[in-house]
Amino acid sequence: MRIPTICFLFLLISLSKSLHIGSCLGLICGRNGHCHAGPVNGTQTSYWCRCDEGFGGEYCEQQCDVSKCGADEKCVFDKDYRMETCVCKDCDINGNSLLKPSCPSGYGGDDCKTQGWCYPSVCMNGGQCIGAGNRAKCACPDGFKGERCELDVNECEENKNACGNRSTCMNTLGTYICVCPQGFLPPDCLKPGNTSTVEFKQPVCFLEISADHPDGRSMYCQNGGFCDKASSKCQCPPGYHGSTCELLEKEDSCASNPCSHGVCISFSGGFQCICDDGYSGSYCQEGKDNCVNNKCEAGSKCINGVNSYFCDCPPERTGPYCEKMDCSAIPDICNHGTCIDSPLSEKAFECQCEPGYEGILCEQDKNECLSENMCLNNGTCVNLPGSFRCDCARGFGGKWCDEPLNMCQDFHCENDGTCMHTSDHSPVCQCKNGFIGKRCEKECPIGFGGVRCDLRLEIGICSRQGGKCFNGGKCLSGFCVCPPDFTGNQCEVNRKNGKSSLSENLCLSDPCMNNATCIDVDAHIGYACICKQGFEGDICERHKDLCLENPCSNGGVCHQHRESFSCDCPPGFYGNGCEQEKMFRCLKSTCQNGGVCINEEEKGRKCECSYGFSGARCEEKINLTGFTEKDSLLRSVCEKRKCSERANDGNCDADCNYAACKFDGGDCSGKREPFSKCRYGNMCADFFANGVCNQACNNEECLYDGMDCLPAVVRCPVKIREHCASRFANGICDPECNTNGCGFDGGDCDNETNATIITNIRITVQMDPKEFQVTGGQSLMEISSALRVTVRIQRDEEGPLVFQWNGESEMDRVKMNERQLTEQHVLSTSISRKIKRSATNIGVVVYLEVQENCDTGKCLYKDAQSVVDSISARLAKKGIDSFGIPISEALVAEPRKSGNNTGFLSWNALLLIGAGCLIVMVVLMLGALPGNRTRKRRMINASVWMPPMENEEKNRKNHQSITSSQHSLLEASYDGYIKRQRNELQHYSLYPNPQGYGNGNDFLGDFNHTNLQIPTEPEPESPIKLHTEAAGSYAITEPITRESVNIIDPRHNRTVLHWIASNSSAEKSEDLIVHEAKECIAAGADVNAMDCDENTPLMLAVLARRRRLVAYLMKAGADPTIYNKSERSALHQAAANRDFGMMVYMLNSTKLKGDIEELDRNGMTALMIVAHNEGRDQVASAKLLVEKGAKVDYDGAARKDSEKYKGRTALHYAAQVSNMPIVKYLVGEKGSNKDKQDEDGKTPIMLAAQEGRIEVVMYLIQQGASVEAVDATDHTARQLAQANNHHNIVDIFDRCRPEREYSMDLHIQHTHQPQPSRKVTRAPKKQTSRSKKESASNSRDSTHLTPPPSDGSTSTPSPQHFMNTTHTTPTSLNYLSPEYQTEAGSSEAFQPQCGAFGNGEMWYTRASTSYTQMQNEPMTRYSEPAHYF
């Protein structure tokens, strides 16, 4: 019975389909077309032919002429099947490529970067994967359901009224049909007839994903359109268009642009014009643009009107054209004066200045130093508020620098040198020929003399017939003896001002060879030669092998020529260094070997090559045959070694560490498959970081071939370093300084960098937590070096994100030395000592952040996953210990918000609970004492901290904010009161109830107290609608009343004004935000209310960079000196934002000027924050702060007794991060103390050496910074660089040791007689711990380095003072000042006293207090010990 019924049903459906197409039965679309029912016109159904590709015409009777197209093209008709055109073979009729990226499993999107379980094609039946990460899911079209849209929806069961009462509903795949009784017609089955009794419900064609429909909207083809399931698109009948064929071609009423000055909106049957401001009429034809040639001042906005215009002024301006300033709009606009209304003045107000100030806004201090000869004898006049002081030149003292001092009294010249006074009474040593140095303490190599030991004694430099001595110098035995005020081989350099008296005459003598350019550099060397390419040396006398610096990028081959080099660039690249990629047009033959030309908006045009080909135009064939054989062999090796059985066991098996073996199941690659996105994954894994550029692997997916295609960084040449430093960031492009090594001339040649920060990089380290606590952030130095970026440990409100690891999950947080990590900032290259790997599964989990300075906007790393892949690839290639620590896993993960362990209370929690119980017991015992006391206890009204309960601690940490003040009402969950429970407890005080004897009132006095009540967890509340709208992108619609304006949301403790001020949405204009803020303040909003992070609306407005809102809030009484939980004021935050304009405005407030030296939680002033962050306006910001009263060398001394005091100045922070413009401003322009020690005894050059800041180290050395000073752990700057594997910086220090001393050491080693030990002079070691008996002032005094400067002054010690001092470990450094340096590597230069073995290990000659052990050793191999701090 069932089989006949089914047969009848299929017969019914087949007949119904035939009847349904109506007049298509008689239409002949030919063999090359398909007939479809078209749009219904009244009761008449039309039809149309859908032609196969290459055919057209009304009945598909015309065939396209292929002969008109190229070999790689095909001939097609347009969408109306009328016009012929040629497109590429893999393109649609509009010329758009049909090729889609073949994304790997788990990734999707146009660029295969979106990660989710349902990508790329898990969803079935037209479903689409949406979302990312844990939120990824399949969005199903109507008619399907299930996790993968694999289930058909039975519409007949879910909707009983799917068909009418007289018809029968029958379910089909994705849709359903309605069957009428025999003899009646659909849709209502009331009309009799003999045609089809079946109504087919059209299935969904495609799913539309948009901003308005993020979960998808089912789209159906209209007007007879045909759904092409292969492309999920509607093919429309002729005359119709649109994604669902919903539009008639003739219905586009806006096609003729009928609106003259407005926007045309088309609708069925007509259109409407939305006119621009100032225009009206049906077609916006009436009116004109009155804003043409308007007079509105810059910064204002012209608003067009019907007959005129008006100017919308910013808050600080007024007048018809915003040409006048409104002092009432900005508090304290008259900085040191009183604002007086003056309607007749040009500004509409006048400032009456206080004594000692001047300027339009009383912003300028009267500079007494403008008077001539205020300070005598080259003294420097320093202007002070209302006064001045004289900083005297060396050799003079007194208030006016008019008292000469005898500087030779304590100034001893060695080797028979004579001390003489210059005209400014500075002591100088006139050395005998053959000796140099500040005190003639260094002897030139045998046979050489002159001020740089660069003149041969047998030749000399002066004679009666030859060279002469200038400036009164006398020629004696071929050499010039100079008067005290001059130095140089020919007395050509003036000691006093550092200028050559001959100036241009020096270069007119043409001292430079090989067409080099001669320039005047500074006082030390007088002139310098800028060499042409291919030459080097002091006077460019030597040929240089330029190819040793690897200047060719992208696999270019370097060729050395006599005076230059050239690069043979691979196809697709050009430029002197093959650094530029050729641009091309997408033509027929652009891409070879089957490649397809794709035009991408962001990346430009490129060829997407067929498999097996690479190159810019797919011209290179990849040798896949050879590698396929190798890969096949490796796969068989993996099978023979049973790698699959040993995979994923937690141990890296080196014999299975191949891409073909999946890197031992991830055991050797941090549990990742780093080359999973790479098209040639196994091949590129083999080529990774092998030193040879492979273009097929030089892309983001293949991790840029391990950076093999990047050029080497060339150092700034020694002889032009000072030249480039003096011209750094001066606004003029100096091409010779426009290199990476020279800092790109400070951006003067438009070479700028943008910093990006990537977070949530999680690594698991097989190391005991105790050992990781000791090593701290230094364990990550090698990662920074290998990835070519800055790597830091990520942190939250509780500190560094480092957790214990039990082999399966994260446990307790590891307490790190936050101060040490903060000081490091940039974690450097490697750990030199062997790391002991944990024998068990115990380890640590560390969350990292990466900061990359992207050249010209091109970053190596797009997201955290790309960083993780690079780490994993290096682990697989170099070993899991390749970063100095054993990394067993690397992945992208968000830090957990709870810091407690998962199975038991931590010892810290137990101790806290125990301490709390002890406090309770003590107080209870006190309350039980006899009540015969007559004196009342003094009660202090202070909050008492209570150790949190276990559940409370979990709740608090689960709901805390990781980033302070960055809250949102648009989060997925909204929890009312849980977040701030600990802070709520701080408002309670714990007192015992009166017990035993005595009067409770006597015990408590008259104090009104509240017994401790631990708040219970309330039910979650819904977000406040007014707050949600304030935080959104559109205008507030909820009424702002006196009652609603100060309602506080329980989660973030914010009012509506907080949410308005923190709104940084680009879609919400600042005009609207200011307007809403005005409404709130008019309704009685508290402008100084603080949220849970103690941020006021003003602070949030500064964070959001809303300058106009900040101006209005301050006018309304907002206090800029309120500090948040990070102990930052609005000025601190403006400095952290690098917002120069906001800082200018903030410093107009006299309130903030008094707090300009205040420290934030990190112990930094606003000037220190500016110095610590690079940026375009940072020097201008620093100058502004100094002009407003910030002290250059302020170290936070006012807060010496607080934990945040570090004793550092702005120069420390600038040197630590290599902020060279700030370093040069502080040292070069403001004379900042170069040798100031912080609390750990570190000077700026020590921090720079420790962090690998080579440019800072060179500059500070040139400026005379001490290199022999030691920190609190008795380490010099060289030792800090050595311990952190910054060998290039160690090399800089070692270059300063002359060949003479090296030869003497070798001579001593060959001598068999014991020598007397050398005297060791060391700067005193600063105490690392303080005695309780010491006063705070003694322990935290800011001190200069000792011994004192050689010249007797209190400024920076002279480096020459330390030239004969040594250290016990390692070998002492001997420093030559820039005045006497010679180019390293030249035939006449001093050679470093160090070398390198083949394995990179350094050797040194020992400089010990005893040479007895070395008598029989011609050379001692010496490995420098590692140091950890």
Swiss-Prot record:
As given in the record, the signal peptide range reads 1-15
The residue spans the entry assigns to the Extracellular side of the membrane are as follows 16-908
Q: Which residues lie on this side of the membrane: Cytoplasmic?
A: 932-1429
Q: Which GO terms describe its biological process?
A: cell fate specification; cell projection morphogenesis; dauer exit; egg-laying behavior; negative regulation of Notch signaling pathway; nematode larval development; Notch signaling pathway; positive regulation of DNA-templated transcription
Give every EGF-like domain span. Answer: 20-61, 114-150, 152-190, 201-246, 250-285, 287-323, 323-363, 365-402, 404-441, 449-492, 503-541, 543-579, 582-619
Sugar-modified residues: N41, N165, N194, N378, N515, N623, N751, N754, N900
In the UniProt record, does the keyword Transmembrane helix occur?
A: yes
Subunit structure and binding partners: May interact with dsl-1. May interact with lag-2. May interact with osm-11. Interacts with sel-10.
Similarity annotation: Belongs to the NOTCH family.
This protein is called what? Protein lin-12
